[in-house]
Structure formats: structure tokens, C-alpha cells
């Protein structure tokens, strides 16, 4: 019987999901994106060649694997077409293998204009968005005024909806945000020019996924960002605009929750965050261990190029993530970045409002007030890069992994020891 796996980030994103999704596509016939947009990147290293993707599922790099963009994704048509062209240039054929949900909300220039203008207006209180229009596009979806992929294929309907939306959003841009408005005719013409390329890929993704599964296909649901950026469960308001947790694999693609059989939580061996928001175990990245993590871990955003904030591993944060996702097993990534550190620290809980708590709180205010409680463990001098078995890891590295398993209560089923596909230790295969 076919089996479906959901891959989610358990921290604030950038956990190394792209490589693991690519590795797992060896055992899947379809890969599905179910939330987010072109605001989150995933980097694959295959045979030493690096490929960065933002919208198209990582499975596209595996010949014969079908890829799906579900209704939970907000779609920038120019960006998905640019990604297709970039892949075509390295010999990867996309259009015949990619299906885009007709219910995807479309990101248009006024969404980007609103996103950028709002961040400028917030000043020091900015959220740290990528400025790509993701949030405003989700707002339109919830307000029931989104232009969806199916609308774009109907020129008359699209033109009417676009005019109505621009009347509304241009009023806000001009009168509240005091910035330039967006031109109707140019927006209309540019969008319609992309329709001939887009149209063959648009369809009923929900039915396609059901048909594939019933025909025996294993499906892999690829989450973007991280669970603590979830709009409901993250450090609100310092969150993204979508649900990043595993449950959204169902609503964001059109399959029932009973079709989600295994939840793989991708967990970095230390903690990082991009942009604003609380981060209890954060370290300064201009010195000491923080600098080591940032430098050795190459901690710069795939999409924005922004330097990531770095800190010690936070087991209390991971407990929250395991809880909200129903994680079956974890994949531990970037263990090799810790090589050479004499002492490691694990955050096991916090002092918060005069009490000791052992799980990350809900919302930014309490999270910002947390004082981390640390447990120290000895590090290791030996290299872990490229290790293929658990026994090949240094004893102290194995002890570090064991301790995290005990603190969180979920097994570590996979360990990534480098960026390439082959640099992976499998203790329990998610698809088996």
C-alpha cells in the first residue's frame, strides 16, 4: 500500500528540508508544496552542483517524479516561470511534470507594493518580511477577494476582478501608505502575457493527488519555512502569513488528514532565525560560538541573503514543535557544524515570570521574556562530515543526539552529515 510522508521544519526555517526532501524522492512518485510562496528557498546539492528553488517542489530534480503546487500556496506567476527557465537551462524539464492548483491565489504587483510600503512604515517595529507580497496575498484570500489561478485563465473575469482589487488597494497605497499606486493596464497586460505558458499546468490538484495515491504512488508533502513561524502557533506577530505545521498539508493540497501517514520533523543541530522576533538561546554572531555557527554553517538566507541569527539548540522549543505537528520521527541536520566545539549547551527550559517552564510559550511576548536554562555536554574534535552510519560518529556526538531524543520524546530517524544526498544516516526510513 502507498504511504505518504509530510516534511516540516521544526524551528524557524532553514533546517535543511530541501536536501531531505530530495533524498526521500527516491521512494516517492509525487512531491507537493502546500503553503507559502516564493518567500522561502530550499537549496539542493547534487553531485557538487547547487540548485536553489523557491516555488517548484524539490522533487523536480528527480527524473520521473511528479510535482504539485497546492491551493495553500500563493503563486507569483513570473517567479514560477523564471524558475522553470532556470531549470530548463540545466536540462530539467518541468511543464509536463508540474501541476498547479486552480485555487492558488495569485500574487500581483499591488501585493508587493503593499508589503514593501508597510515594512517601511513600521520602521524599527518591522516584522522582517521578504517584501515579496506573500502576506497581502494571503489577506486577500481570507477577505475573499483573491484572484486565483482559475480566474487568470478567464480574461474577462480576471480583468473585472483586477480592476475591483486595484481600486481598493490603490486607495490604501495612495491615501494611507502615501506611496505610488499600481497601474491597471500594465498589470493586466503583463499577467495575461504569461497565461499561455501557465495554462497547461493549471488543474485540479486535489483529484490528481487522490488518483496518484489510489494508483499506488507514495506522496511527499514538502513544507516551507518552520513551525515556529506558523501564523497561529509561532511567535506571533513575528511569523509568516501561512500555516507551516503538518496539518496544513491536508488543507493546503486538498487531501484528507487520514492520508498523512508519517510526519518527519527536520531539526538543525543548533538553532537559527532570520529577521525579527524573540530567540531565547541566541548568541552574538560576531564572536565565539555564535560566529562559529554562522561561519561554518554558512548561515545566510537562500532568498534574501540576510545573515541568520544563531544560537544553542533549544529542546524546549522543539517540544512545542513536536506537539503542534504530531511528529513521528526527526531528521537531525548540520551536525557537522558542531565539529570542533569543546562544550555544547542545550536549552532544556526557561525561567518565565518567576516559574520554570519546559516548553516554548505561545506568542512573542512570553517568548521574549524567557531566560534560557542550559545543560552542558562535552563536544567532539573528530569530523562527522560524510559519516554513513551511527557507529561512525564520535561517542560524544551520539550522546548529544541521545540526549535530545530523551528531552523531546521523539526518535531521531535520520541524521544528515553534509549537504550532499549521500551524506545521510538512516536509522528508520520514513517510507518503510
Curated annotation (Swiss-Prot):
It is an enzyme of class 6 (ligase). It is found in: Cytoplasm. Binds 1 Mg(2+) ion per subunit. IMP binds at residues 14-17, 39-42, 130, 144, 225, 240, 306. InterPro entries: Adenylosuccin_syn_GTP-bd, Adenylosuccin_syn_Lys_AS, Adenylosuccinate_synth_dom1, Adenylosuccinate_synth_dom2, Adenylosuccinate_synth_dom3, Adenylosuccinate_synthetase, P-loop_NTPase. GO terms for biological process: 'de novo' AMP biosynthetic process; IMP metabolic process. It holds the Pfam family Adenylsucc_synt. Mg(2+) binds at residues 14, 41. GTP binds at residues 13-19, 41-43, 308, 334-336, 416-418. One of its GO terms (cellular component) is cytoplasm. GO terms for molecular function: adenylosuccinate synthase activity; GTP binding; magnesium ion binding. Substrate binds at residues 302-308. It comes from the Bacteria. Its cofactor is Mg(2+). Gene3D superfamilies: Adenylosuccinate Synthetase, subunit A, domain 1, Adenylosuccinate Synthetase, subunit A, domain 2, Adenylosuccinate Synthetase, subunit A, domain 3. Its EC number is 6.3.4.4. Keywords: Cytoplasm, GTP-binding, Ligase, Magnesium, Metal-binding, Nucleotide-binding, Purine biosynthesis. Pathway: Purine metabolism; AMP biosynthesis via de novo pathway; AMP from IMP: step 1/2. It catalyses: IMP + L-aspartate + GTP = N(6)-(1,2-dicarboxyethyl)-AMP + GDP + phosphate + 2 H(+). The active site is at residues 14, 42. PANTHER family: ADENYLOSUCCINATE SYNTHETASE. Homodimer. Plays an important role in the de novo pathway of purine nucleotide biosynthesis. Catalyzes the first committed step in the biosynthesis of AMP from IMP. Belongs to the adenylosuccinate synthetase family. This is Adenylosuccinate synthetase. The lineage of its organism: Bacteria, Pseudomonadati, Pseudomonadota, Betaproteobacteria, Burkholderiales.
Amino acid at each position: 500500500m502507498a504511504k505518504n510522508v509530510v516534511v516540516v521544519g521544526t524551528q524557524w526555517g532553514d533546517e535543511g528540508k530541501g536536501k531531505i526532501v530530495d533524498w526521500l524522492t527516491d521512494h516517492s512518485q509525487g512531491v507537493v508544496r502546500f503553503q507559502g510562496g516564493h518567500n522561502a528557498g530550499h537549496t539542493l546539492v547534487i553531485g557538487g552542483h547547487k540548485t536553489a528553488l523557491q516555488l517548484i517542489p524539490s522533487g523536480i530534480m528527480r527524473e520521473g517524479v511528479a510535482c504539485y503546487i497546492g491551493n495553500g500556496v500563493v503563486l507569483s506567476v513570473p517567479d514560477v516561470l523564471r524558475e522553470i527557465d532556470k531549470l530548463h537551462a540545466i536540462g530539467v524539464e518541468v511543464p509536463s511534470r508540474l501541476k498547479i492548483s486552480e485555487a492558488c491565489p495569485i500574487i500581483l504587483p499591488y501585493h508587493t507594493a503593499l508589503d514593501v510600503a508597510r515594512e517601511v512604515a513600521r520602521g524599527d517595529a518591522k516584522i522582517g518580511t521578504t517584501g515579496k507580497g506573500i502576506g497581502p496575498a494571503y489577506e486577500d484570500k481570507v477577505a475573499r477577494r483573491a484572484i486565483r489561478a482559475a480566474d487568470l485563465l478567464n480574461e474577462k473575469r480576471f480583468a473585472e476582478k483586477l480592476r475591483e482589487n486595484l481600486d481598493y488597494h490603490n486607495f490604501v497605497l495612495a491615501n494611507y501608505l502615501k506611496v505610488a499606486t499600481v497601474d491597471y493596464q500594465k498589470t493586466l497586460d503583463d499577467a495575461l502575457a504569461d497565461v499561455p505558458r501557465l495554462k497547461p499546468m493549471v488543474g485540479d490538484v486535489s483529484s490528481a493527488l487522490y488518483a496518484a495515491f489510489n494508483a499506488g504512488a507514495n506522496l511527499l508533502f514538502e513544507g516551507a519555512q518552520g513551525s515556529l513561524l506558523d501564523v497561529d502557533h509561532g511567535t506571533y506577530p513575528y511569523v509568516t502569513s501561512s500555516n507551516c505545521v503538518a496539518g496544513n498539508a491536508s488543507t493546503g493540497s486538498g487531501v484528507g488528514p487520514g492520508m498523512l501517514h508519517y510526519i518527519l520533523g527536520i531539526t538543525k543541530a543548533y538553532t537559527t532565525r532570520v529577521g525579527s522576533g524573540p530567540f531565547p538561546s541566541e548568541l552574538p554572531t560576531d564572536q565565539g560560538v555564535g560566529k562559529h555557527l554562522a561561519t561554518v554553517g554558512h548561515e545566510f538566507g537562500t532568498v534574501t541573503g540576510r545573515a541568520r541569527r544563531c544560537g544553542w539548540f533549544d529542546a524546549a522549543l522543539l517540544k512545542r514543535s513536536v506537539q503542534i505537528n504530531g511528529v513521528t520521527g526527526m531528521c537531525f541536520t548540520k551536525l557537522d557544524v558542531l565539529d570542533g566545539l569543546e562544550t555544547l549547551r542545550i536549552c532544556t527550559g526557561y525561567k518565565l515570570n518567576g516559574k520554570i517552564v519546559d516548553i516554548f510559550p505561545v506568542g512573542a511576548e512570553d517568548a521574549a521574556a524567557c531566560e534560557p536554562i542550559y545543560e552542558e555536554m562535552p563536544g567532539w574534535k573528530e569530523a562527522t562530515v560524510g559519516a554513513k552510519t551511527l557507529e561512525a560518529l564520535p561517542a560524544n556526538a551520539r550522546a548529544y543526539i541521545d540526549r535530545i531524543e530523551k528531552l523531546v520524546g521523539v526518535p531521531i530517524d535520520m541524521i544528515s552529515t553534509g549537504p550532499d544526498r549521500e551524506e545521510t544516516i538512516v536509522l528508520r526510513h520514513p517510507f518503510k
